Every structure is written in structure tokens, then in C-alpha cells.
Amino acid sequence: RCAHGTYYSNDSQQCLLNCCWWGGGDHCCR
């Protein structure tokens, strides 16, 4: 599982910061 505020990216095979964490908006959330 990825940490809070991150999501798993299949492309890069790792957890990345979720842009919602930075106020990016729902389209970024997983």
C-alpha cells in the first residue's frame, strides 16, 4: 500500500505524491 498522500503509479512502478495532497483537484486522486 502507498502512504497517505501518495498513489501507486504503474508506469513508474512506485508510489508517487498525489497531486491532491498539494491541492491539485479530484482528477488527480486515485
From Swiss-Prot:
The lineage of its organism: Eukaryota, Metazoa, Spiralia, Lophotrochozoa, Mollusca. Contains 3 disulfide bonds. Expressed by the venom duct. It is found in: Secreted. The keyword Disulfide bond applies. Its main location: secreted. The keyword Disulfide bond applies. Coiled coil: none annotated. This is Conotoxin Bt12.1. The cysteine framework is XVIII (C-C-CC-CC). GO terms for cellular component: extracellular region. It comes from the Eukaryota. One of its GO terms (molecular function) is toxin activity. Keywords: Disulfide bond, Neurotoxin, Secreted, Toxin.
